[in-house]
């Protein structure tokens, strides 16, 4: 089983690390190339390109100027301990055991606008580049065009025969993969909450639940659809009545 999640805009580079083991991103050369393009953009251009404030644009301009591949130990860390959004709160990688981190490294992949595809322990530097950013790269009109074939081929290479690919990424990031060209079965869990008498996907809760699902599947060293269905964290439970397509299981609370 392989699991896919999105990165996070919020980063954490100061918290003490539970493990100093790191690996190297498979698309580090591509990350270096993309940064070389970003490096030429002024703070004003970055602000417009990324729809961010002047202060954030200045911060990321500075990040782009000092970006290095391969990363050294200065201001860099394993991706799973660097991203700090709702999904990562739900996962809580800092409290995983050494054995669970090994399973996480084998099963989890993080989609990234800059690095393409990351293993949890792949070392990264602080950056901001969402997959939906309209950044032109040579003949490619945007990041989707740049990454689609590369990411799809890499995933097909990593997936073993019969292995499930569990999509816990956002639509923005999963769209960077050519879903029809993936050779394995894709399972996309959905998380819904009752609100005002109706079942709805509430973004904050759904994101956190995706992270909790990752943790559940790591703790179980999961491999089957039944392992996915057994998820019960934070009051969620698999609903066979709400689930119409078994490749899109729905969890409710």
Task: Annotate the PLM regions.
Residues 4-95:
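Active-site helix-to-loop segments that bind/position phosphate- or nucleotide-bearing substrates
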Residues 93-245, 253:
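Internal, well-folded beta-alpha domain core
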Residues 248:
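Acidic metal-coordinating catalytic centers involved in nucleic-acid phosphodiester chemistry
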């Amino acid at each position: 089983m392989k699991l896919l999640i999105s990165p996070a805009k919020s980063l954490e580079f100061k918290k003490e690390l539970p493990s100093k083991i790191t690996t190297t991103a498979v698309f580090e050369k591509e990350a270096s190339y993309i940064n070389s393009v970003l490096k030429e953009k002024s703070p004003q251009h970055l602000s417009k390109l990324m729809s961010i404030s002047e202060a954030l644009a200045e911060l990321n301009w500075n990040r782009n100027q000092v970006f290095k591949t391969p990363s050294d130990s200065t201001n860099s860390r394993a991706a799973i301990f660097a991203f700090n959004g709702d999904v990562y709160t739900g996962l809580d990688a800092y409290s995983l055991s050494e054995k669970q981190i090994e399973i996480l490294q084998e099963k989890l992949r993080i989609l990234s606008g800059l690095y393409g595809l990351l293993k949890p322990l792949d070392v990264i530097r602080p950056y901001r580049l969402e997959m939906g950013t309209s950044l032109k790269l040579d003949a490619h009109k945007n990041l989707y065009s740049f990454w689609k074939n590369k990411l799809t081929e890499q995933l097909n290479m990593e997936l073993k025969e019969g292995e499930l690919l569990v999509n816990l990424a956002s639509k923005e990031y999963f769209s960077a993969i050519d879903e029809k060209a993936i050779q394995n079965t894709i399972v996309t869990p959905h998380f819904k909450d009752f609100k005002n008498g109706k079942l709805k996907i509430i973004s904050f809760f759904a994101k956190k639940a995706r992270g909790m699902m990752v943790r559940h599947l790591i703790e179980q060293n999961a491999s089957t659809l039944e392992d996915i269905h057994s998820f019960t964290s934070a009051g969620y439970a698999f609903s066979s009545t709400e689930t119409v397509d078994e490749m899109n299981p729905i969890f409710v609370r």
